[in-house]
From Swiss-Prot:
Cofactor details (free text): Binds 1 Fe cation per subunit.
Principal localisation: secreted
Gene Ontology biological process: pollen germination; seed germination
Enzymatic reactions: 1D-myo-inositol hexakisphosphate + H2O = 1D-myo-inositol 1,2,3,5,6-pentakisphosphate + phosphate; a phosphate monoester + H2O = an alcohol + phosphate
Presence of keyword Transmembrane helix: no
Binding site for Fe cation: 194, 221, 224, 398
Organism: Arabidopsis thaliana (Mouse-ear cress)
Annotated protein name in UniProt: Purple acid phosphatase 15
Active site: 369
UniProt subcellular location: Secreted
Single GO MF descriptor: 4-phytase activity
Effect of pH on activity: Optimum pH is 4.5.
Enzyme class: hydrolase
Length: 532
């Protein structure tokens, strides 16, 4: 027995030692740290050209391409999406007939026996610009099929397409999420924002794949098609380069390039997306979000939402809430009412972890987009806090920042940890200036989000100023580097967050911390707070 105990101690001691070397939120709040800027890292923010073989069409006829997976509301169902046929772009375009080809997924637990079949629906969307000299776009046929009745934590093989046309994909596979319980979680959840399709993006995805995620969260700003004119001319700053255009144009083929580049990953690992400002894509008749809402499948119906712009889902013992910053969010809005109902239904004995995501951050100390989402914060922060939100992921700011636990700008041991992860690699390059740097505090009236409007960013700092004169207390760590993060739930109270930088080796850590829930110290406040 003594020998067995000694052997067990020797086996566990490296893990214990390693765990002790990683800080936890129990050690906080932390003194704010700024990692000095490495000026050599701003290059490579250049989009892949349409001649790159990774973005070119590699199928013929109506064979499926741009295959992707997304979760439904729980472990027993999943969405499979793909595109068939070729997009059209020109002054006059004629949409393909979505009823001309079937939407079928054949699947099973054995690669050589795909004995089950599911059918879904198909659609096309158009991006129309009724102005002289501008080109219109209509997509290939987009298919969405929901597979149901799946077993948890199980590998399934599948192929998609139309078997009657002999237009089927090769066989792919995915693993379903574990059942919702306090003891079962996805192995690794990759988190990335503001991805785009640059050479930096390729580095981000290469590093991300090395970490073998079971699920991917993309926190807005996907293809950056709206940095292009309809003829394919591009710029890092659309408004600077094209101030005279009659409407903010887009080049929709960039979405197809993005889907092709990502297929090797998204055909195996579910991708959950929330919209960013680059997905708005205004067109004729004031239509918005057409590409975003058409190309991805969302569990909005399953989660009681009426919009692709906000929804929720479970992944094991985690309840994820994906919120829309570019649709009404005030306390009289449909989204706010939906959020109240969604949070009220969460059973923390089944899904102990509550993780929220939306695009523009509430807690960021960079000059870029500083306090831009203050009105959303005023509307929703108390509600999310009262239901004990554990972690919040945001993008929009092209850098990395992790907060101390915070609520209403005050350090609070029961507040969420806010993580800005808008460093995926897009062509607008990194954010490098901080609002507390001398001369870098923006003019207050320039900060409100131009889409939702309104000004809510009143003075709030200890010296009653718009900006801090030092790195804010809520900011634990900030660094301007491209990268991605990995979230690993260890149990119902401990989660490991790791941030990886593109310039490092795939296994080198840029930031790492255990995020620890304290349900005994931080009981839920929703019965004490009036949200009427």
């Amino acid at each position: 027995m003594t020998f067995l105990l000694l052997l067990l101690f020797c086996f566990l001691s490296p893990a214990i030692s390693s765990a002790h070397s990683i800080p936890s939120t129990l050690d906080g709040p932390f003194v704010p740290v700024t990692v000095p800027l490495d000026t050599s890292l701003r290059g490579q923010a250049i989009d892949l050209p349409d001649t790159d073989p990774r973005v070119r069409r590699r199928v013929i006829g109506f064979e499926p391409e741009q295959i992707s997976l997304s979760l439904s509301s729980d472990h027993d169902s999943i969405w499979v999406s793909w595109i068939t046929g070729e997009f059209q772009i020109g002054k006059k375009v004629k949409p393909l007939d979505p009823t001309s080809i079937n939407s079928v997924v054949q699947f099973g637990t054995l690669r050589h026996s795909l004995s089950h079949e599911a059918k879904g629906h198909s659609l096309v969307y158009s991006q129309l610009y009724p102005f002289d000299g501008l080109l219109n776009y209509t997509s290939g046929i987009i298919h969405h099929v929901r597979i149901t009745g799946l077993k948890p934590s199980t590998i399934y093989y599948y192929r998609c397409g139309d078997p009657s046309r002999r237009a089927m994909s090769k066989i792919h596979h995915f693993r379903t999420m574990p059942v919702s319980s306090p003891s079962s979680y996805p192995g690794r959840i990759a988190v990335v924002g503001d991805l785009g399709l640059t050479y930096n993006t390729t580095d981000t995805i290469s590093h991300l794949i090395h970490n073998s995620p079971d699920l991917i969260l993309l926190i807005g700003d996907v293809s950056y098609a709206n940095l292009y004119l309809t003829n394919g001319t591009s710029s890092d700053c659309y408004s600077c380069s094209f101030p005279e255009t009659p409407i903010h144009e887009t080049y929709q083929p960039r979405w197809d390039y993005w889907g092709r580049f990502m297929e090797n990953l998204t055909s195996k690992v579910p991708l959950m997306v929330i919209e960013g400002n680059h997905e708005i894509e205004l067109q004729a008749e004031n239509k918005t979000f057409e590409a975003y809402s058409s190309r991805f499948a969302f569990p909005f119906n399953e989660s009681g939402s009426s919009s692709t712009l906000y929804y929720s889902f479970n992944a094991g013992g985690i309840h994820f809430v994906m919120l829309g910053a570019y649709i009404a969010y005030d306390k009289s809005a449909e989204q706010y009412e939906w959020l109240k109902k969604d949070l009220a239904k969460v059973d923390r004995s089944v899904t102990p972890w509550l993780v929220a995501s939306w695009h523009p951050p509430w807690y960021s100390s960079y000059t870029a987009h500083y306090r831009e989402a203050e009105c959303m914060k005023e509307a929703m922060e108390e509600l999310l806090y009262s239901y004990g939100t554990d972690i919040v992921f945001n993008g929009h700011v092209h850098a990395y920042e992790r907060s101390n636990r915070v609520y209403n700008y005050e350090l609070d041991p029961c507040g969420p940890v806010y993580i800005v992860i808008g460093d995926g690699g897009n062509r607008e390059k990194m954010a490098i200036e901080h609002a507390d740097d001398p001369g870098k505090c923006p003019e207050p009236l320039t900060t409100p989000d131009p889409v939702m409007g309104g000004f809510c960013a009143w003075n709030f700092t200890p010296s009653d100023k718009f900006c801090w004169d030092r790195q804010p207390d809520y900011s634990a760590l900030r660094e301007s580097s491209f990268g991605h993060g990995i979230l690993e739930m260890k149990n119902e109270t401990w989660a490991l967050w790791t941030w990886y930088r593109n310039q490092d080796s795939s296994s080198e850590v840029g930031d790492q911390i255990y995020i620890v829930r304290q349900p005994d110290r931080c009981p839920l406040h929703h019965r004490l707070v009036n949200h009427c």
